[in-house]
């Protein structure tokens, strides 16, 4: 069975409440439940995790590196700041997909730089919640090629 880890970074626990004009009206629990059901139908195990703490995200990437086939991450605000999370990905060498609900390149100037895009397998940005489905499909396809 394919094991996929979904990590959501800071403030994504506020989905549905935080700036719905940018991030939509679904909450994180709804998104995760839909993805878990989809993954199960495709014979995959999807584990979901959200944290506002950079160190917890780094710890999780390290801890799950041996049991995870691919990681999907929405790093939230850490996209533009976290060398520590970037270094964790480089250290464990687990393929990962970077995802953003909004198009980070169509927003404020400081949001246009990602510390992850150049080391990610791929980046999905600007498709709203559908981006999570696209990332899950891409992760499953990536694993089937191994």
PLM regions: where:
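Short, glycine-/small-residue-rich phosphate/pyrophosphate-handling segment
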Residues: 47-48, 106-146
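Short glycine-rich anion-binding loops that position phosphate/pyrophosphate groups of nucleotides
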Residues: 10-12, 76-79, 102-104
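Glycine- and acidic-residue-enriched helix-capping/strand-helix junction motifs
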Residues: 15-29
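Extreme N-terminal starter segment of soluble prokaryotic enzymes
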Residues: 1-4
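Short Gly/Thr/Asp-enriched flexible loops that form oxyanion-binding sites at enzyme active sites
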Residues: 63, 82-91
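Short, acidic/small-residue loops that bind anionic groups at enzyme active sites
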Residues: 91-107
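Short beta->alpha junction loops
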Residues: 45-55
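Short acidic/histidine-rich motifs immediately flanking catalytic phosphotransfer sites
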Residues: 64-71
């Amino acid at each position: 069975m394919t094991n996929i880890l979904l990590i959501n970074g800071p403030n994504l626990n506020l989905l549905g409440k935080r700036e719905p004009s940018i991030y939509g009206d679904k909450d994180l629990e709804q998104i995760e439940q839909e993805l878990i059901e989809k993954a199960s139908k495709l014979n995959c195990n999807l584990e979901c995790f959200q944290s506002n703490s950079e160190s917890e995200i780094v710890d999780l990437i390290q801890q799950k590196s041996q049991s995870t086939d691919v990681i999907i991450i929405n790093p939230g605000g850490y996209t533009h700041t976290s060398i520590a999370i970037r270094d964790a990905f480089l250290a464990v060498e687990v393929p990962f997909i970077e995802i953003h609900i909004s198009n980070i390149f169509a927003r404020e100037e400081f949001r246009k730089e990602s510390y992850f895009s150049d080391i990610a397998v791929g980046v999905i940005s600007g498709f709203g919640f559908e981006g999570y489905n696209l990332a899950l499909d891409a992760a499953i396809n990536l694993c089937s090629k191994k």
